[in-house]
Swiss-Prot record:
The organism's place on the tree of life at top rank: Bacteria
GO MF annotations in UniProt: metal ion binding; phospho-N-acetylmuramoyl-pentapeptide-transferase activity; UDP-N-acetylmuramoyl-L-alanyl-D-glutamyl-meso-2,6-diaminopimelyl-D-alanyl-D-alanine:undecaprenyl-phosphate transferase activity
NCBIfam families registered for this protein in UniProt: mraY
A Gene Ontology biological process term: peptidoglycan biosynthetic process
Family annotation (HAMAP family): MraY
Species the sequence originates in: Chlamydia felis (strain Fe/C-56) (Chlamydophila felis)
CDD domains: GT_MraY (cd06852)
Reaction(s) this enzyme catalyzes, per UniProt: UDP-N-acetyl-alpha-D-muramoyl-L-alanyl-gamma-D-glutamyl-meso-2,6-diaminopimeloyl-D-alanyl-D-alanine + di-trans,octa-cis-undecaprenyl phosphate = di-trans,octa-cis-undecaprenyl diphospho-N-acetyl-alpha-D-muramoyl-L-alanyl-D-glutamyl-meso-2,6-diaminopimeloyl-D-alanyl-D-alanine + UMP
Underlying gene: mraY
Membership in a protein family: Belongs to the glycosyltransferase 4 family. MraY subfamily.
Record has Cell wall biogenesis/degradation as a keyword: yes
Membrane topology type: Multi-pass membrane protein
This protein's name: Phospho-N-acetylmuramoyl-pentapeptide-transferase
Task performed by this protein: Catalyzes the initial step of the lipid cycle reactions in the biosynthesis of the cell wall peptidoglycan: transfers peptidoglycan precursor phospho-MurNAc-pentapeptide from UDP-MurNAc-pentapeptide onto the lipid carrier undecaprenyl phosphate, yielding undecaprenyl-pyrophosphoryl-MurNAc-pentapeptide, known as lipid I.
């Protein structure tokens, strides 16, 4: 195992902690004005859920809670990037593209939900097509930032080491596909996890911190420094948003937040060539998305449900476990996943 201290630069750690603090304070300061604006614009959560009468009953008190609070993530992340990253670097504009594009997709979905009586957003097919395009632009940009492709065709393997897959077309195709899968999968997984007060926000904070450790331990990666700043900002704003999102929530992140978080978190992993670490660090996200996939597959193939309701957190709600207990237990699982991911990074 490498000594973690061999990777830690005291000035870098102090700087990243300062970035976290900056993001936290700005998020706390902007939180109430953003919530007030969302209420004024009537961005309220839609509780009408077809075939989920029990969820409507359980969440009936949430209909007066504003959604689309992800604009807070949008604003603070952009502020941090424009203040702290050099504008001449292509990676800076890749971050800007990721935040603006994924945030805009989520924002549009929230707008559509607001206008429709039953709270339906854009169709899954429409969303997937846009996600496919956005992830492709991100991966292609990373490919061309790395002119020699020595970075793009490497892969950080948990508990093992960083491996070079070669410069063949097959290796590039594999890396391209893995990166696309990571971005699309993570954006949807975070979106599915965002269903209870504070759940997705808390898990985001933990997984972002874990990936930040991976970034710090990737000194040979030319993009690691910039990625670490973005991740430190994401940790800080997540903590600030949790102030307003924990039970009883004053605001929900909505698709504006969940799609943005998933998109930028996975984009950071792609730039670090650490997509496989998302399986550990985002273990709760994986479980939530996996429960939906299994439920749909079982209903179509066996005509039976595996879970009382999916995603997984709703299954436990259906069993009568209070929302705060479900969130607390998922947070504990998320913490264990984060610790496991950090150990996987150190044990190499």
């Amino acid at each position: 195992m490498h000594s973690v201290f061999s990777y830690l630069n005291e000035s870098l750690i102090l700087f990243l902690v300062t970035v976290m603090g900056f993001a936290f304070l700005v998020g706390i300061f902007l939180g109430k004005p953003v919530i007030h604006w969302l209420k004024k614009q009537n961005y309220y959560d839609q509780v009408q859920k077809e075939h989920c009468a029990k969820l409507e009953t359980l969440h009936k008190d949430k209909k007066y809670t504003p959604t689309a609070g992800g604009v807070l993530f949008f604003l603070v992340l952009l502020m941090s990037i424009f203040f702290l990253l050099p504008l001449r670097k292509p990676s800076t504009w890749l971050f800007v593209f990721s935040i603006v594009s994924w945030g805009s997709l989520g924002w549009y979905d929230d707008i559509v939900k607001k206008k429709r009586k039953k709270g339906h957003g854009i169709t899954a097919k429409q969303k997937f097509i846009v996600q496919l395009l956005l992830s492709a632009v991100t991966v292609i940009t990373v490919f061309f930032i790395d002119k020699e492709n020595s970075l793009f065709c490497t892969l950080q393997v948990p508990f093992f080491r960083t491996i070079f897959l070669g410069s063949s077309i097959l290796a590039k195709l594999f890396c391209f596909s893995l990166a696309m899968l990571a971005i699309i999968g993570t954006s949807n997984a975070v979106n599915l996890t965002d269903g209870l007060d504070g759940l997705a926000t808390g898990i985001t904070c933990m997984s972002s911190f874990g990936l930040l450790i991976v970034a710090i331990m990737s000194p040979t990666n030319p993009l690691a420094y910039d990625v670490s700043i973005v991740l430190a900002t994401l940790v800080g704003i997540s903590l600030a948003f949790l102030r307003y999102n924990c039970s009883p929530a004053q605001v929900f992140m909505g698709d504006t937040g969940s799609l943005l978080i998933g998109g930028i978190l996975a984009s950071c992993a792609v730039m670090l060539r650490a997509e496989l670490f998302l399986i550990f660090l985002g273990g709760v996200f994986v479980a939530e998305a996996g429960s939906v996939i299994l439920q749909v597959a079982s209903c179509r193939l066996r005509k039976k449900r595996i879970f009382l309701c999916s995603p997984l957190h709703h299954h436990y709600e259906y069993k009568g476990i209070p929302e705060t207990q479900v969130v607390a237990r998922f947070w504990m699982a998320g913490l264990l996943c984060t610790v496991l991911g950090i150990v996987a990074a150190l044990w190499r």
